[in-house]
Regions:
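N-terminal acidic leader/helix
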Residues: 1-34, 51, 56
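Short, charged, amphipathic alpha-helical segments
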Residues: 10, 35-46
Length: 60
């Protein structure tokens, strides 16, 4: 059961990491298109990072 929990947490971390990378890429693209307001993404990225680190603590 513990192995399944660790596998699930690892999978969640991978998905959170992918989401963070995607948000960062969108933010980078907005440098080319400053008229697009993506300020809400900064908050979303912070939330994802927090979740990522909480999961890391659970794995330890």
């Amino acid at each position: 059961m513990n192995n399944k929990k660790n596998y699930d947490l690892k999978l969640i971390k991978q998905k959170l990491n992918a989401a963070m990378v995607l948000i960062e890429e969108v933010q980078n693209l907005t440098e080319e298109f400053p008229e697009v307001n993506t300020s809400y993404l900064a908050g979303a990225l912070d939330d994802l990072e927090q979740q990522y680190y909480e999961i890391e603590e659970l794995q330890d």
